[in-house]
UniProtKB/Swiss-Prot annotation:
<dbReference type="GO" id="GO:0046872">
    <property type="term" value="F:metal ion binding"/>
</dbReference>
<feature type="binding site">
    <location>
        <position position="414"/>
    </location>
    <ligand>
        <name>Zn(2+)</name>
    </ligand>
</feature>
<protein>
    <recommendedName>
        <fullName>DNA ligase</fullName>
        <ecNumber>6.5.1.2</ecNumber>
    </recommendedName>
</protein>
<keyword id="KW-0436">Ligase</keyword>
<dbReference type="InterPro" id="IPR003583">
    <property type="entry name" value="Hlx-hairpin-Hlx_DNA-bd_motif"/>
</dbReference>
<feature type="binding site">
    <location>
        <begin position="31"/>
        <end position="35"/>
    </location>
    <ligand>
        <name>NAD(+)</name>
    </ligand>
</feature>
<dbReference type="Pfam" id="PF03120">
    <property type="entry name" value="DNA_ligase_OB"/>
</dbReference>
<keyword id="KW-0464">Manganese</keyword>
<dbReference type="InterPro" id="IPR033136">
    <property type="entry name" value="DNA_ligase_CS"/>
</dbReference>
<dbReference type="GO" id="GO:0003911">
    <property type="term" value="F:DNA ligase (NAD+) activity"/>
</dbReference>
<keyword id="KW-0234">DNA repair</keyword>
<feature type="binding site">
    <location>
        <position position="180"/>
    </location>
    <ligand>
        <name>NAD(+)</name>
    </ligand>
</feature>
<feature type="binding site">
    <location>
        <begin position="80"/>
        <end position="81"/>
    </location>
    <ligand>
        <name>NAD(+)</name>
    </ligand>
</feature>
<dbReference type="Pfam" id="PF03119">
    <property type="entry name" value="DNA_ligase_ZBD"/>
</dbReference>
<dbReference type="GO" id="GO:0005829">
    <property type="term" value="C:cytosol"/>
</dbReference>
<keyword id="KW-0520">NAD</keyword>
<dbReference type="InterPro" id="IPR004150">
    <property type="entry name" value="NAD_DNA_ligase_OB"/>
</dbReference>
Length: 784
């Protein structure tokens, strides 16, 4: 056998030993024999360097250090999971799944359907993506923000149980595998012992050790660390395989990818809870750290039907374990001032180690929480790291209270600016007029004249997901505020080179770059600008909803709270926060100053198609909380009377032609109140002013462009929801079905389309992708 043949044989044999050791947990040779084969291959490759390939087992040792990681955009976003902390949270998740799939159990008297779930431990490590092309590992990336991560390809190649090339056959030409890189408890102990012996820094816990090791610019350091990988799913694939989550993982295992040995199937939520309790009981005996378990709807078809909400799937949830707890002493309670002026208490603690991290501060949320706990300064308390991250005071140990323990007092003046601190009653708004007390918050009234509020407002405004002004970190913002150079976000656009260059940390080049970044920020998308304003309770996703649905800042500024509730995922409380923010004179002045600085908002335009299509006069009436009148009654009312004016003016005889006696009386009673009439007219007037229009005439399906045609929607549509696409197709006369048959006229297939697309191709049914569908609808006069 010549050298080339021997090298090929050794690689194949070592790959098989790796597969049996890391994936099957069935070592086939002693370690000494493996080492002998490995060293023989290493020696042969040294003699014949032209035969060295990237997928050789010897190429896991790491290469030259990088200056920095480059960015990688995830073709399919790496989404986070929703959390469940109590059994009731998990039961609520199961109920939402059952309702979302329209299974039995949605009403009070039906037996709850048992959904099939997959169950696996939630490893406490770092989420990564592995991209294989034609079976070869070509890229590794971190999760990052879910959309963009860091290219860690060189480092993931050093992780021993990540195959550099896939085993077997039948894998897709493009296969993105997702999973967790972690460090076992034993590996962590060995690493810390070695670090201590060498006089180096030890790590607080395995997760920090794994994350720090994987993100080393010098891959040789990564190669020396005991990292492991476990896959939990896939991202982009060139062709789908499997019809269940467990089926996909089992297939990945045959291709050499390690999956959890604790992977199980559960028939219904009770079996999920039993799995959670079992893993919890064995948690300390597992060879790795976990912080919960993950449950996923096993059927891929059901996953697609359930879809996503914001940045998390509706078909999966992480059931977290209770955080680890410790006793310590409250040395003092100090007050911090946040971006919105809220004055919040923070407990200063006698330092104590919790879950591997030294804790000296803990959140107390607000004074109501202090009252609930009965907390005094000097008390001994139980603290825990909520979600294993944020230290939180859970309970006061009263029998350890010292005689000199003193109550916590709210400052009457802001600890930062000296302005008055006011108590504001919080309310939880129902759909009607009633409010429910939700405690109180203390706020500094200094607004942007308070340095603490101003600093936090500017830090938020310049952040990467807001205006993305590079070069302005917290310390730089503090300097600008402390020097009196900025008193509102608008002052950023008045900064001059001479003012910046003299600041600590700035030189000529960095000063010019900062000013260039500030100038470049004058063309933000509408969503970024809304998010940057720092409206209470308005995060990145809500800002996108506002921008996408209302289409312009002018509409967002004047939108009534009731109109805002028509938007996806915006409830009445958040709607009032948005409305109140734009009603505030000071906020309007700051926005006017920003626009006057040369701000040019991008992506402004008409009302969003989804919002326009989903908002009807009947829908508006249903949201008014007219006694006894729900969506169906509202539809009947509009079908019979047609306009809001006629509905308001209708007498009992007119109303009873559309509704039953109780409903008719509810409508009359509601509109007897002049305030309700004014509210309804104001909402309608605003919607009409925004460009909405009510159509009272119903066309029959006959004569419509798609009359008699059956269409099917599959996959994920990115420019609209499937509900909107369905509604618009039905407007054109089509019937939208849930399955493909020989009678199907056309299938609209978005990313992730599976069995329905395959069936359409098999039957020769016409298929449109999303862009083609949008173009087709435009030809019919409908803009999506």
């Amino acid at each position: 056998m010549n050298a080339e043949s021997r090298i090929h044989a050794l690689r194949a044999e070592l790959d098989q030993h790796n597969y049996r050791y890391y994936v099957l947990d069935e070592p086939s040779v002693p370690d000494a024999e493996y080492d002998r084969l490995f060293n023989e291959l290493k020696a042969l490759e040294a003699e014949h360097p032209q035969l060295v390939t990237a997928d050789s087992p010897t190429q896991r040792v790491g290469g030259a250090a990088l200056a920095a990681f480059s960015q990688v955009r995830h073709e399919v976003p790496m989404l986070s999971l929703g959390n469940a902390f109590e059994e009731d949270d998990l039961r609520d998740f199961d109920r939402r799944v059952v309702e979302g799939l329209d299974l039995p159990g949605g009403d009070l008297f039906a037996a709850q359907a048992a959904v099939d779930y997959s169950c696996e431990p939630k490893l406490d490590g770092l989420a990564v993506s592995l991209l294989y092309r034609d079976g070869q590992l070509v890229q590794g990336a971190t999760r990052g923000d879910g959309t963009t991560g860091e290219d860690i390809s060189t480092n993931v190649r050093t992780v021993r149980n990540i195959p550099l090339k896939l085993q077997g056959e039948g894998w897709p030409a493009v296969l993105e595998v997702r999973g967790e890189v972690y460090m076992s408890k034993a590996g962590f102990d060995r690493l810390n012992a070695a670090q201590a012996e060498a006089g180096g820094k030890t790590f607080a816990n395995p997760r920090n050790a794994a994350a720090g090791s994987l993100r080393q610019l010098d891959s040789k350091i990564t190669a020396s660390r005991p990292l492991e990988f476990c896959c939990y799913g896939v991202g982009q694939v060139s062709e789908p395989f499997g019809d269940s989550h467990i089926g996909i993982l089992e297939k990945l295992k045959t291709w050499g990818l390690p999956i959890s040995r604790e992977l199980r199937h559960a028939a219904g939520i009770e079996e999920c809870l039993a799995y959670y309790r079992d893993i919890g009981a064995r948690r300390n005996d597992l060879p790795y750290e976990i912080d919960g378990v993950v449950f996923k709807v096993n059927s891929l078809a059901s996953q697609r039907e359930l879809g996503f909400r914001a940045r998390e799937p509706r078909w999966a949830i992480a059931h977290k374990f209770p955080a680890m707890e410790e006793l310590t002493e409250v040395l003092d309670v100090e007050f911090q001032v946040g971006r919105t002026g809220a004055v919040t208490p923070v407990a200063r603690l006698k330092p104590v180690k919790v879950a591997g991290v030294m804790v000296s501060n803990a959140t107390l949320h607000n004074m109501d929480e202090i009252a609930r706990l009965g907390l005094r300064i000097g008390d001994t308390v139980i603290i825990r790291r909520a979600g294993d991250v944020i230290p939180q005071v859970m309970q006061v140990v009263l029998d350890r209270r010292p005689e000199n323990a003193r109550p916590v007092e709210v400052p009457t003046e802001c600890p930062v600016c000296g302005s008055q601190v006011e108590r504001t009653q919080l309310v939880k708004r129902s759909k009607g007029k009633e409010t429910i007390s939700e405690g109180a918050v203390y706020r500094c009234v200094g607004r942007l004249s308070c340095a603490a509020q101003l600093k936090q407002a500017i830090i938020h405004y310049v952040s990467r997901r807001a205006m993305d002004i590079d070069g302005l970190g917290e310390k730089s913002v503090e300097q600008l505020v402390d020097e009196g150079l900025i008193r509102s976000p608008a002052d950023l656009y008045k900064l001059e080179f001479e003012q910046v260059v003299v600041l600590e940390g700035f030189a000529e080049v960095s000063s010019r770059k900062l000013l260039e970044a500030i100038e470049a920020s004058k063309r933000p998308s509408l969503a970024r600008f809304i998010y940057a304003l720092g409206i209470p309770d308005v995060g990145e996703e809500t800002a996108k909803v506002l921008a996408r649905s209302l289409g312009s800042l002018a509409r967002v500024q004047v939108a009534l709270p009731q109109v805002l509730t028509y938007l996806p995922d915006i409830g009445l409380e958040v709607a009032h926060e948005i409305h109140n923010f734009f009603e505030d004179t000071h906020n309007r002045e700051v926005i006017a100053q920003l626009l006057a600085s040369g701000m040019q908002l991008q992506e402004e335009g008409e009302l969003g198609a989804e919002f326009a299509a989903s908002t009807t006069l009947a829908g508006m009436l249903a949201k008014l909380d007219i006694p006894s009148v729900g969506p169906t009654g509202a539809e009947k009312l509009v079908d019979k009377l047609g306009t809001l004016d006629k509905i308001i003016a209708a007498d009992g005889i007119d109303l009873r032609q559309a509704l039953n006696t109780k409903q008719a009386e509810g409508v009359r009673e509601f509109f007897r109140d002049e305030a309700n009439q004014l509210l309804a007219r104001a909402i309608e007037a605003q919607l009409l002013d925004f460009g909405m229009h009510w159509s009272c005439e119903k066309r029959s399906a006959e004569g419509l462009p798609l009359a008699g045609q059956t269409w099917v929607l599959t996959g994920t549509l990115e420019r609209m929801s499937r509900d909107v696409a369905k509604e618009q197709l039905e407007r054109l006369g089509a019937k939208v079905a849930g399955s493909v048959s020989g009678k199907t006229h056309c299938v609209v297939a978005g990313p992730g389309a599976g069995s329905k697309l395959a069936k359409a191709n098999e039957l020769g049914v016409k298929v449109l992708d999303e862009e083609q569908f949008v173009a087709f609808m435009a030809e019919q006069g409908i803009t999506l």
